């Protein structure tokens, strides 16, 4: 049912109501208890001439109800009931929308002669009647008469449905039809291939072309996108690991630089220690060391070449009884110890006293001891005392 009122119908209702209101406001009303000529509205008296039982009034047809007023801008166009449309039998005029009342007046029912067209107040009553009917009919839904619509499916009609025609169902109004819903036959959401539609006999023909070929399945596209997304995430994880290793490499480089700095410091300190204490030789000649490593026993059992042997080396000999006896080694004469040059050591110790000893009294004591020292051991003792005092 149409829930909206058209603008033209609204204008008709307003004009009808204004005509009725103007009629009752302009008509003179005199209150009385009797129906006399003085109280009858002009134009109504001829109605009383006819038989009251023959009450007949013509109602407007559907053609009159659906007509629109073209000259609404210039004024209201009255609705005229023609005498040619009079039916059989009289019909009582319904009571008007507004009762004609006055001082002590009563509402009177008036009947109309079939030969006389309604004028005056009857014309207003007819207008009100028509307006009421329009208002009632507007909110009453009419029954719909339509033929069943055959269902149309994609891919063209079947062999049995090719000869049938499709008649659309009317909605008797201006609203849009909701139509019928059908599930798509394509899982990917694309429009599949469709045949040409046959021309409809009861409708205006239209140009129909061949539908496009089926598009690529949307599921396959989504699978490809998901695979690319997974690979991208895997690459991102690898890049994160590489960046983490890079930070670790940077940390290792920093630690290596620290180790190198510490090692250089230790090497510098060791060089300083070597300068301060170069060390002492053992005092054993190299020849003696070599000879000690080459000593061995040689047995001469008979005549032969004994030039390789040395008389200084211990050798076993046979006595008269052929018994091996060692020949005693002759006693060695002790060699005098070479006099070492202590002047360089004294210069070094003097420099140590000057740089390492800050106390003047201790410095003076070390200088006195250095002047009295004549052996290497004494110089070593003085050097150790200087280092201890510096620490």
Swiss-Prot record:
Its subcellular locations are: Virion
Cite the entry's keywords alphabetically. Coiled coil, Phosphoprotein, Viral RNA replication, Virion
Principal subcellular localization = virion
Is Methyltransferase a UniProt keyword of this protein? no
Q: Where is this region: X domain (XD)?
A: 348-391
Coiled coil feature spans: 218-245
What residues bear Phosphoserine in this entry? Answer: 69, 188, 257, 292, 294, 301, 374
Q: Where is this region: Interaction with the nucleoprotein?
A: 343-391
Q: Which Pfam family, any one of them, does this sequence belong to? A: Paramyx_P_V_C
* UniProt record, GO biological process: negative stranded viral RNA replication; negative stranded viral RNA transcription
Q: How does it assemble?
A: Homotetramer. Interacts (via multimerization domain) with polymerase L; this interaction forms the polymerase L-P complex. Interacts (via N-terminus) with N0 (via Ncore); this interaction allows P to chaperon N0 to avoid N polymerization before encapsidation. Interacts (via C-terminus) with N-RNA template; this interaction positions the polymerase on the template for both transcription and replication. Interacts with host RPS6KB1 kinase; this interaction may play a role in the viral replication and transcription.
Family, per entry: Belongs to the rubulavirus/avulavirus P protein family.
The protein's name in its UniProt record: Phosphoprotein
Species the sequence originates in: Mumps orthorubulavirus (MuV)
Source gene? Answer: V/P
């Amino acid at each position: 049912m149409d829930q909206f009122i058209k603008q033209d119908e609204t204008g008709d209702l307003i004009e009808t109501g204004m005509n009725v209101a103007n009629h009752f406001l302009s008509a003179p009303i005199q209150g009385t208890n009797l129906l006399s000529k003085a109280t009858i509205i002009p134009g109504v008296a001829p109605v009383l001439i006819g038989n009251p039982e023959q009450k007949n009034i013509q109602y407007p047809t559907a053609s009159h109800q659906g007509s629109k007023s073209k000259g609404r801008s210039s004024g209201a166009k009255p609705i005229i009931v023609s005498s040619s449309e009079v039916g059989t039998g009289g019909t009582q005029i319904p009571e008007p929308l507004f009762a004609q009342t006055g001082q002590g007046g009563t509402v009177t029912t008036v009947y109309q002669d079939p030969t006389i067209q309604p004028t005056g107040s009857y014309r207003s009553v007819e207008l009100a009647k028509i307006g009421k009917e329009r208002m009632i009919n507007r909110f009453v839904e009419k029954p719909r008469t339509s033929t069943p619509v055959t269902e149309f499916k994609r891919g063209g009609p079947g062999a049995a449905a090719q000869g049938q025609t499709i008649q659309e169902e009317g909605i008797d109004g201006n609203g849009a039809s909701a139509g019928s819903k059908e599930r798509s036959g394509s899982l990917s959401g694309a429009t599949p291939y469709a045949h040409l539609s046959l021309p409809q006999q009861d409708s205006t023909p239209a140009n129909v072309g061949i539908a496009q070929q089926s598009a690529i399945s949307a599921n396959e596209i989504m699978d490809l996108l998901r695979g690319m997304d997974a690979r991208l995430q895997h690459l991102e994880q690898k890049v994160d690991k590489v960046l983490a290793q890079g930070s670790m490499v940077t940390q290792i480089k920093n630690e290596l630089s620290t180790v190198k700095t510490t090692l250089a410091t230790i090497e510098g300190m060791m060089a300083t220690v070597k300068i301060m204490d170069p060390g002492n030789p053992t005092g054993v000649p190299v020849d003696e060391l070599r000879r000690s490593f080459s000593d061995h026993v040689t047995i001469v059992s008979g005549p032969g070449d004994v030039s390789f042997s040395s008389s200084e080396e211990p050798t076993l000999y046979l006595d008269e009884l052929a018994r091996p006896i060692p020949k005693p080694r002759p006693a060695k004469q002790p060699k005098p110890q070479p006099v070492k040059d202590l002047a360089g050591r004294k210069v070094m110790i003097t420099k140590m006293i000057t740089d390492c000893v800050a106390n003047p009294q201790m410095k003076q004591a070390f200088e006195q001891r250095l002047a009295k020292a004549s052996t290497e051991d004494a110089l070593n003792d003085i050097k150790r005392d200087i280092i201890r005092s510096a620490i």
